[in-house]
Design a protein with these regions (language model features):
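Charged, well-structured binding/catalytic surfaces in domain cores that contact anionic ligands
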Residues: 160-161
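Ligand-binding pocket scaffold of soluble enzyme catalytic domains
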Residues: 153-157
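Short coil/linker segments at helix-helix boundaries
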Residues: 5-28, 32-35, 46-152, 164-188
Length: 188
């Protein structure tokens, strides 16, 4: 059992150094193919997964032991979440004209089932920004956008990635600031 833990720790160490190298590859692909929404999606996924899986994990573990180092990890992850958010807004804008404005106004968009990963990863980057900023109001205002994105995705494909959309939506309901007293019950 101990050896598998060491192997996992070793693998995590490799990922910590290898994944940021892939960011340069993603940026190059975006530069060379800036009208292809898939390159933005792939870059966003990498940024978000690295931020949650490596940086936020380290920050959370260090928060009460080495506050200033933890803050540095949160700050770095926030920067990556914001870049990921920007990539996903760009990707969805390529797929749906005036996407960002429509999202802010919660207007109807004719999303397709192929949009589900885009909606999910945009909501994930927004949620990550809230978490990494420790609830900074500048990012907290995205809670309604996260809910809107996930609700639209669930309508399209409720079983996507074995219920990942519902798992994400539970967090939204549990952090609902709208005053809806049934919000927690809806989540459960």
């Amino acid at each position: 059992a101990c050896s598998s833990n060491k192997d996992l720790m070793f693998g995590a160490g490799i990922a910590e150094y290898a994944i940021p190298i892939s960011f340069k590859s993603h940026e190059k692909k975006i530069k060379n193919d800036s009208f292809n929404s898939i390159v933005y999606l792939n870059a966003s996924k990498s940024l978000t997964q690295y931020s949650y899986g490596i940086l936020m994990e380290k920050a959370d573990r260090l928060m009460y032991v080495d506050y200033y180092t933890a803050r540095d990890y949160y700050s770095e992850s926030l920067d990556l979440f914001l870049k990921s958010r920007s990539y996903m807004v760009q990707a969805l804008s390529l797929r749906h004209s005036d996407f960002e404005s429509k999202m802010m106004k919660k207007e109807s968009i004719n999303f397709k089932i192929d949009d589900v990963p885009y909606l999910y990863w945009l909501s994930g980057s927004m949620a990550g920004s809230i978490q990494a900023s420790q609830g900074d109001p500048e990012h907290l205002i995205d809670l309604t956008n996260i809910r809107w994105l996930l609700e639209n995705a669930i309508v399209l494909d409720p079983n996507w990635e074995k219920g990942s959309l519902y798992a994400a939506m539970m967090s939204v309901y549990l952090n609902d600031l709208s005053g809806d007293q049934d919000s927690e019950r809806k989540a459960l």
